[in-house]
């Protein structure tokens, strides 16, 4: 849309230049006393009038602000762009990212990337092609303020599930677990020098415990090596086995995150058949009950997959009823041609609306925006404050002697 608008405005300029050349032959061009040709007055006059017309335009359609500001009485959901056909609609202005800085101006970004390569660790930032990787890994490199964060993905880079929105590689028989991964992960986090880390996992349905014991070992190793670190574990549903959920919830993590991903109606078309909307709610609710509310729980919703407004509202209600404390909402972007297509681009005002509604429902924190992802670093600043406030109050122990990790089979 923005490109077509730009080209449309350029055509009159080109046409005016052609007309001016036709109307004023070289032999008849006005000349000054020295015989030199005067400036092309026709072009100057046209450009003056053109600039004046743009400056006085009141339609709101000829500027970037016009795309972002909604007319009065127009609901935010009505401003979304869609339905879409691949190749027919460019990204709207609010999804255009700034050009990344050069390597010399991103020391934090380069340090984290080099660290991951050396230790052969995977990150969901790269595997899932997250658009915020420069901002999160850079941690405010350009401004010099901010904290670099990264999402480390444990248990390899191959997932046994095939969700239709995700670009992580899928395999029925992934490589065996690396017994050295807990130590490598702890070393990598220590080298990063970060205050907040997100540890996520691929689903490993090929393992009897879904990899729960391995996750616990990774969390424990990271916390022992980095005692002051705040750690968020973004994990799967472990086949819906609540004993495995308890095992992970009883580890020394700070935030238990599990994404519901989308509204209930479209879940079968979006997520792998082994995942379900109700199973995800059951996992989140059980964590809250098992820890007696001491554990901060978090989930995420994607927009642009065919959901309706009331369905998003109901999903927020369901999450809050399950005891979820923090939620993020972001725009789904198709990572490759083999993944689900985007049904619509939600307007920034719609994300603002959902943030307000979520906070009104009682969520302690909500990050809502077109480029927000479940591990988006903007949310972690606020979550850190919540966790530090809770540290001043002695929380009941959630560990259980029966939850000692056993080897993943």
From Swiss-Prot:
- Main site of residence? mitochondrion
Q: Where is the Radical SAM core domain?
A: 142-364
Q: Which Gene3D superfamilies match?
A: Aldolase class I
Q: Which Pfam families match?
A: LIAS_N, Radical_SAM
The segments labelled Disordered in the record are 21-41
Residues that bind [4Fe-4S] cluster 1, according to the entry? 125, 130, 136, 375
Q: Which cofactor does it need?
A: [4Fe-4S] cluster
Enumerate the UniProt keywords alphabetically. 4Fe-4S, Iron, Iron-sulfur, Metal-binding, Mitochondrion, S-adenosyl-L-methionine, Transferase
Q: Which GO terms describe its cellular component?
A: kinetoplast; mitochondrion
Q: What reaction(s) does this enzyme catalyze?
A: [[Fe-S] cluster scaffold protein carrying a second [4Fe-4S](2+) cluster] + N(6)-octanoyl-L-lysyl-[protein] + 2 oxidized [2Fe-2S]-[ferredoxin] + 2 S-adenosyl-L-methionine + 4 H(+) = [[Fe-S] cluster scaffold protein] + N(6)-[(R)-dihydrolipoyl]-L-lysyl-[protein] + 4 Fe(3+) + 2 hydrogen sulfide + 2 5'-deoxyadenosine + 2 L-methionine + 2 reduced [2Fe-2S]-[ferredoxin]
Q: Which pathway features in its UniProt record? A: Protein modification; protein lipoylation via endogenous pathway; protein N(6)-(lipoyl)lysine from octanoyl-[acyl-carrier-protein]: step 2/2
Q: What is its EC number?
A: 2.8.1.8
The record's section on SMART domains has: Elp3 (SM00729)
Q: Which NCBIfam families match?
A: lipA, PRK05481.1, PRK12928.1
The entry's protein name is: Lipoyl synthase, mitochondrial
């Amino acid at each position: 849309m923005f490109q077509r608008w730009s080209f449309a405005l350029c055509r009159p300029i080109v046409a005016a230049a052609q007309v001016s050349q036709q109307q004023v032959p070289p032999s008849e061009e006005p000349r000054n006393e020295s015989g030199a040709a005067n400036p092309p007055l026709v072009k100057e006059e046209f450009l003056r009038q053109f600039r004046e017309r743009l400056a006085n335009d009141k339609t709101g359609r000829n500027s970037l602000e016009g795309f972002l500001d909604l007319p009065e009485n127009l609901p935010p959901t009505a401003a979304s762009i869609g339905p879409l056909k691949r190749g027919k609609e460019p990204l709207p202005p609010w999804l255009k990212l700034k050009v990344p800085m050069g390597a010399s101006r991103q020391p934090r970004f380069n340090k984290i990337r080099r660290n991951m390569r050396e230790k052969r660790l995977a990150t969901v930032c790269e595997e899932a092609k997250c658009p915020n990787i420069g901002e999160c890994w850079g941690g405010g490199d350009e401004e010099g303020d901010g904290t670099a964060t990264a999402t480390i993905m444990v248990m390899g880079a191959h997932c046994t599930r095939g969700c239709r929105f995700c670009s992580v590689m899928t395999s029925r028989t992934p490589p065996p677990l690396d017994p050295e991964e807990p130590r490598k992960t702890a070393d990598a986090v220590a080298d990063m020098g970060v205050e907040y880390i997100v540890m996520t996992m691929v689903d490993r349905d090929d393992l009897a415990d879904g990899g729960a014991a391995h996750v616990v070992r990774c969390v424990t190793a990271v916390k022992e090596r980095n005692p002051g670190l705040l750690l968020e574990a973004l994990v799967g549903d472990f086949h819906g086995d609540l004993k495995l959920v308890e095992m992970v919830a009883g580890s020394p993590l700070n935030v238990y995150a599990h994404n519901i991903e989308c509204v209930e109606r479209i879940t079968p078309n979006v997520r792998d058949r082994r995942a379900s909307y109700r199973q995800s709610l059951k996992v989140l609710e059980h964590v809250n009950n098992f820890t007696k509310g001491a554990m901060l729980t978090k989930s995420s919703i994607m927009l642009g997959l065919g959901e309706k407004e009331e369905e998003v509202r109901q999903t927020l209600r369901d999450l809050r009823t399950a005891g979820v404390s923090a939620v993020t909402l972001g725009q789904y972007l198709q990572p490759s041609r083999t993944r689900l297509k985007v049904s619509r681009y939600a307007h920034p005002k719609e994300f603002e609306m959902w943030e307000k509604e979520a906070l009104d429902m009682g969520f302690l924190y909500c990050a809502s925006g077109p480029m927000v992802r479940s591990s988006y670093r903007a949310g972690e600043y606020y979550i850190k404050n919540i966790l530090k406030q809770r540290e001043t109050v002695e929380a009941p122990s959630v560990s259980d002697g029966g939850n000692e990790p056993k080897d993943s089979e």
